[in-house]
Structures are given as structure tokens and as C-alpha cells.
């Protein structure tokens, strides 16, 4: 049967490298996150209303009156956090082990990253709290930095002259449909991956040593699922508001700006890069480039080795990059004052320098050391 054949060749008889580590678990974990988000989101949508007058109340109603509504709501909110943790780990794995040399798979991955970020942003607007409203206002307003068409574009997206009813309704519509587009893209992502098969930690072709996906990696994925669900439940049942902003428990008020407008933690690194450039258009470009720079990475790969496993200089740079991203995440949540401004600017410059200049340079040195 053709459908069973696809399932069999993707999940059961798939030849898989025998030495892939836990860093290869995040793909399936992202799949699990997507399923959790679609299911919890579907049940939330059954009780949510996307009108400015009732949106905030409908979320309160879900938490207070719907059976296990509080659980569904917090699973969905914190599920997004787990989604991004897995996403960043997955991308980091790709950079470390040179998986980006699978160009089609990598590029669809970048499109997926953008799609998930767009979905999360629009989802954050839906509860219609203070941070929802002002986050939507600030981020959509960035498009006005586009020369000539900017202002028209922003008003077109808003459906008026400010973030209002029309904006909320369309954001709900987009937030509902995007996850299904993401699911379709995931299939394409996997289709391209299965053309080549998985990479492995050594970066050396493993065609001579493949094992069937089932039972070896089905059981390994199942363990990953259990760990993810455990962590998600710990978050949801013990401190569901740990990662949220208390301002979002205040209903949206266009006449009152919150003291610190900031996105959810998973966007803070990009927000810090955006703010560290004292020019609107420049900031927007830096913001887009902070993710789009991933598309350039494959073309800067000049090392004779694929993986960083045996490249100590590149390894150090990689972990400095991780530390730098954590620094940017911290700065994104701080007010725009001394010394945070300078730290943010240094961290932003370092971010692009490591990826575009220092890593290729390190590869060059490593090639020389190995007399290649």
C-alpha cells in the first residue's frame, strides 16, 4: 500500500547511522511539539473569541470555567517555549555537525524557523493583554521603516490606523492556519532529508554502517518524548507563569504603555540585536539578518571536515556564539540604559563576526594545521 510504504520507509525500515547522539532527537521532539500545539490550540480555539471586546474575557473563561481549560491554556503557552528550546537546539546541532551541507533540508528548515516565529508572535497577540497589544504595535510598526511603501504596508496589515479589531481577527486566522502550513513544510523537510539520509556526529559518510530506524531509534525517540513531556508538565503544573509577562494579565489599553515592552524570552536575542542599532531601518535589517544569516553558513564552509567534532578552534567559537546568544537574550529583557546598550551592541557585533568572519578563519587555520 502506497501510504504504508511511505510510513515504512520513513519510520521503520529507514537506514539510519548507528552513532547519532541525543542531539539527533530534537527533530522528532519538534514534531511532538507541533502535534501538542495543534491539539491544544484546536481545543483553545473552540472557546476563544477573536474580538477586542471579548478576547481577554474568553481566555479568562477558558482558565476558570472550561473543564481543564487552565491545563490546555498553559500547555499551549509553555508548549511554545519547549518548541523554541528544541528549535534552537536543533539548529545548533545543525551548525555544530555541519548538517547544513544538506542545502534543501537546511533552507526549508530556515523557512520553518521563520514560520514558527511568525506563528508564535501572532499567538502572543491573541489573549489581548497589555504586552499582546503593545508587542503587536511595536513589531508591526517596524515595517514602516521600509522606504516609500512602509506606512501603507503597516496600515494594510493593521486593517486600520492602529492595532485594533481587524488586526486581532486576522492574527487569529493566520495563527490558526500557519501550523498546518508548517506541518506541510515539515513533510517536505523530511522528504529532502530522506534523499540523503541523516548526518552523524563524525561528519563522515556512514553508508557502510546503517541500522534500521525501528526499533533502535523509535525507542530512543520515545525516551526523548517522555523527557520532553516531563519537563513540559513540570513547567505547566508547578510554575506556569514562570516564562510569561505579568503585564499580559492586564487587559489591552491603547492609552497606557507598559514601562518595558519586551517579547517572550525566545525572541529576546533578536530583539536585543534590533535595539542595538540606533536606526529604524538598520535595526529591522539586522533583525532579519540575525536569522537569515543561517542561509549564508553553508557557503562559508571552507573546512575540509564536515563536523566540528575534530575541530577544537571552531568548537571554542561555537560555544562562544552560544554564550553570546545567551548574553543577547539577557540584554533583550533589560531596559535601554547604560551599561546594557553597550553590552548589547558588542554582543550583536560579536554574533555576526563569529558567523561571518571568525568561523571561516578558524576553518582556514585548522586546514593549515592539518596540512590540507
UniProtKB/Swiss-Prot annotation:
GO terms for cellular component: mitochondrial inner membrane; respiratory chain complex III. Binds 2 heme b groups non-covalently. It is a multi-pass membrane protein. A ubiquinone binds at residue 194. Heme b b562 binds at residues 76, 175. The keyword Cell inner membrane does not apply. Heme b b566 binds at residues 90, 189. GO terms for biological process: mitochondrial electron transport, ubiquinol to cytochrome c. The chain crosses the membrane at residues 26-46, 70-91, 106-126, 171-191, 219-239, 281-301, 313-333, 340-360. InterPro entries: Cyt_b/b6_C, Cyt_b/b6_C_sf, Cyt_b/b6_N, Cytb/b6-like_sf, Cytochrome_b, Cytochrome_b_C_euk/bac, Cytochrome_b_N_euk/bac, Di-haem_cyt_TM. Its main location: mitochondrion. It is found in: Mitochondrion inner membrane. Its cofactor is heme b. One of its GO terms (molecular function) is ubiquinol-cytochrome-c reductase activity. PROSITE patterns: CYTB_CTER, CYTB_NTER. It holds the Pfam family Cytochrome_B. Keywords: Electron transport, Heme, Iron, Membrane, Metal-binding, Mitochondrion, Mitochondrion inner membrane, Respiratory chain, Transmembrane, Transmembrane helix, Transport, Ubiquinone. Heme 1 (or BL or b562) is low-potential and absorbs at about 562 nm, and heme 2 (or BH or b566) is high-potential and absorbs at about 566 nm. The cytochrome bc1 complex contains 11 subunits: 3 respiratory subunits (MT-CYB, CYC1 and UQCRFS1), 2 core proteins (UQCRC1 and UQCRC2) and 6 low-molecular weight proteins (UQCRH/QCR6, UQCRB/QCR7, UQCRQ/QCR8, UQCR10/QCR9, UQCR11/QCR10 and a cleavage product of UQCRFS1). This cytochrome bc1 complex then forms a dimer. PANTHER family: CYTOCHROME B. Belongs to the cytochrome b family. Component of the ubiquinol-cytochrome c reductase complex (complex III or cytochrome b-c1 complex) that is part of the mitochondrial respiratory chain. The b-c1 complex mediates electron transfer from ubiquinol to cytochrome c. Contributes to the generation of a proton gradient across the mitochondrial membrane that is then used for ATP synthesis. This is Cytochrome b. It comes from Sylvilagus transitionalis. The gene is MT-CYB.
